[in-house]
Amino acid sequence: MFQSRFTILIRTLNSSKSRHFSSTIEPTKPQFPQTLAGLRARLAAESPSLSEFSDLQSNNSYSVEVGTKKKPLPKPKWMREAIPGGDKYVQIKKKLRELKLHTVCEEAKCPNLGECWSGGETGTATATIMILGDTCTRGCRFCNVKTSRTPPPPDPDEPANVAEAIASWGLDYVVITSVDRDDLPDQGSNHFAQTVQKLKALKPHMLIEALVPDFRGDPGCVENVAKSGLDVFAHNIETVEDLQSVIRDHRANFKQSLDVLMMAKDHAPKGTLTKTSIMLGCGETPEQVVKTMEKVRAAGVDVMTFGQYMRPSKRHMPVSEYVTPEAFEQYRTXXLVSYVLFSLLISV
């Protein structure tokens, strides 16, 4: 049933000129400088147009089932990740232990950890540093980070320590994220801004992405981070609009998340990218995914990424289905958002 519905959806998109969107940046040569302009050029060059959005072949399906408790099915072969390793991976892990820093890569048991830390196919080593502690004030059904209504207070020296640590590594791109801190008056936004500013002072050319919580939709908090000097302002909507209340904490919602992204676009310096992500395999339908993409596009978001949800433990929300690589590719080529990236593996 999913196969036929997905194919019909693709044909509808192909025939609808009103939904044709493409990047406004011309493709460039394969080699791009490690700058924000280079990042924008690379994204534009790698993002196909709607004309490349073709039907799935008859022997492909949207997803495969995950089985039941009584009759579990093994992971598909494309979901089996390699064991982490490599010089950069070892170096980053050693430094994290020495400095007692937290990463969402480890806290959330992200299956992409090895590829990101080692540099992957591009050789660009990335890491996602988690600030404001390792305890979240919210409890989303998919997330492995521990929770508490009253987490320990933030370390006032953390922005400087994190900046100095990251500056000493051989990273080209760093993502700074955090747990939700509903217990703090500023939701932790000033901590974010200080960390970005101190890191930029030490490494002006390093690309910095701030993956922030929703700050309860507070415009002042969003503005503070958006004007901190970052290159990419990211906030994840996590899932399609129709599944928000099922998957996310009750204090989060789709409209509030889109509002945060739009406010960031208004306040950030011209050229700053905005980005969001959703998980697939949570029970969503292809129609719901496309509808969500359209609303993300209407909100002016530059980059949207997709990932297969992977259950971090038996206590968490089960995987509904494993979405096939072919289906991921069809979403990527839909061009409903300026730049669409995808990964088969994601944990949060």
Curated annotation (Swiss-Prot):
UniProt-listed InterPro entries: Aldolase_TIM, Elp3/MiaA/NifB-like_rSAM, LIAS_N, Lipoyl_synth, rSAM
Binding site for [4Fe-4S] cluster 1: 105, 110, 116
Known EC number: 2.8.1.8
Record key words, sorted: 4Fe-4S, Iron, Iron-sulfur, Metal-binding, Mitochondrion, S-adenosyl-L-methionine, Transferase, Transit peptide
Names of required cofactors: [4Fe-4S] cluster
Radical SAM core domain segment(s): 121-341
Cellular location(s): Mitochondrion
Signal peptide stretch: none
Keyword Ribosomal protein carried by entry: no
Catalytic activity entry: [[Fe-S] cluster scaffold protein carrying a second [4Fe-4S](2+) cluster] + N(6)-octanoyl-L-lysyl-[protein] + 2 oxidized [2Fe-2S]-[ferredoxin] + 2 S-adenosyl-L-methionine + 4 H(+) = [[Fe-S] cluster scaffold protein] + N(6)-[(R)-dihydrolipoyl]-L-lysyl-[protein] + 4 Fe(3+) + 2 hydrogen sulfide + 2 5'-deoxyadenosine + 2 L-methionine + 2 reduced [2Fe-2S]-[ferredoxin]
UniProt GO MF annotations: 4 iron, 4 sulfur cluster binding; lipoate synthase activity; metal ion binding
Keyword Mitochondrion: yes
Top EC group: transferase
NCBIfam families from the UniProt entry: lipA, PRK05481.1, PRK12928.1
The family this protein is said to belong to: Belongs to the radical SAM superfamily. Lipoyl synthase family.
The protein, known as: Lipoyl synthase, mitochondrial
Species this chain originates from: Ricinus communis
Protein encoded by which gene: LIP1
